[in-house]
């Protein structure tokens, strides 16, 4: 009787015995989740690095509001020459200092202009294009100066701190020199327009 109860019939009259499904279990290593997390982190880092490079390239392709950067071009010309010819390290360092000083000058100029640019933009006196161009220029100068610091560290490890100080001194000395030359030119213009007579000592002759 018990055997009959444990047997079931199908619709066509045949009978079959019930079978429980077999569940197959697989063991997973404890390192598997860690591997997935590691792959995810590496992928995110690679994506972030690629995104930053694309953004830097996009920024560098924007037109500059300054003139051509001769100090930048001169440094890379000397650096390229040093690969084929023997050029003294001091020459390369001097060119890099000049490049760094130009970056400092442009950075100070942009900081000086920033309040006026912000005010003009808020008042609607300048458009979105010029505003973005100004922001792009600020980022370009930051990238340029960071690159000079990396070059300074490559040329002489531990030179960065002194390099920054010397760049600022060069920048200020160049500013004084430009101001002095501007005064001399203004003096020549005034002498010519007013028909003044100046002796060798720089004094006015009656």
Swiss-Prot record:
InterPro entries for the chain: Sec66
> For side Cytoplasmic, which residue ranges?
49-206
The residues forming the signal peptide are: none
Lumenal side of membrane: 1-27
- Transmembrane ranges, per UniProt, are 28-48
Record key words, sorted: Endoplasmic reticulum, Glycoprotein, Membrane, Protein transport, Signal-anchor, Transmembrane, Transmembrane helix, Transport
Q: Name one GO cellular component term.
A: rough endoplasmic reticulum membrane
**Coiled-coil stretches, from where to where?**
none
User: Chief location of this protein?
Assistant: endoplasmic reticulum
Topology of the protein relative to the lipid bilayer: Single-pass type II membrane protein
Gene Ontology biological process:
filamentous growth; post-translational protein targeting to membrane, translocation
Q: Where in the cell is it found?
A: Endoplasmic reticulum membrane
Q: Which residues are glycosylated?
A: 5, 12
Extra information? Present with 7820 molecules/cell in log phase SD medium.
Its biological purpose:
Acts as a component of the Sec62/63 complex which is involved in SRP-independent post-translational translocation across the endoplasmic reticulum (ER) and functions together with the Sec61 complex and KAR2 in a channel-forming translocon complex. A cycle of assembly and disassembly of Sec62/63 complex from SEC61 may govern the activity of the translocon. SEC66 is required to attach or retain SEC72 in the SEC63 complex. It is essential for growth at elevated temperatures.
Family classification: To S.pombe SpBC409.21.
On assembly, the entry states:
Component of the heterotetrameric Sec62/63complex composed of SEC62, SEC63, SEC66 and SEC72. The Sec62/63 complex associates with the Sec61 complex to form the Sec complex. Part of a complex consisting of KAR2, SEC63, SEC66 and SEC72.
Q: What is this protein called?
A: Translocation protein SEC66
Q: What phylogenetic lineage does the species belong to?
A: Eukaryota, Fungi, Dikarya, Ascomycota, Saccharomycotina
- State which gene encodes it: SEC66
